[in-house]
Amino acid sequence: MLWRGSKKKEVNGFVFDIGVSSMQLDNPDRGFSFQKEGSLDMRMDSKGKTAAELIENIQENELADLIYNYGDERNSRRIAKKIVEYRKNNKINTTLELATIVKSCFPSKYYKKHPATKTFQAIRIYLNNEIEELCAGLNNASQYLSKGGRLCIVSFHSIEDRLIKNFFQFGKDNLDLERNLFYKYRNKVIKPNNKEIEINPRSRSAKLRFAIRNEREFSSIKLTELGFELV
């Protein structure tokens, strides 16, 4: 997010709805969905390596760390091992191929979420540098928020929610109050109710957090300062 606007450079509020969109999920050619056959791409744009290229070349331990750190997937070691074993004799080129491999690492009983959900999220987040981009977006928004301005973030993944929470609280817990940017912060996350989920099932994982900007001078907050040491 780069500023284009008046010389005052102040905004009363920002709303971030982060992550992949329904249009991207519903297009099998983008490779984001584990429920539709498509090329294993997962890139937000056409730059950089695809998910298929990443999976083909990454070391098993690195893949396990990636799935665990970016997806909070407890079975990451088993999944990584299964993927590496499969790719010895086969290329993994499609979304359903990867989803089937991941699914085979779980018991036959099914859960509320598809077994491949966290693995797909982890690969997508890593591939598109989404955590780094989110941190940059939070910093940019905080820089241009006016005193009393609201910053509202809707996230869909625990690692994103943790980053947002740590950003809003930064300076309060470590007593570096001069760098704390928000004087009012709703600590309790807001989630969709049953009626909202019935209307839009994809909202079931949504979490809304918001905070109100104080008068302190902006100072950029690094990802490592928020407790993130990612692969």
Regions found by a protein language model. Name each.
Residues 1-231:
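S-adenosyl-L-methionine-dependent methyltransferase catalytic core, i.e., the SAM/SAH-binding region
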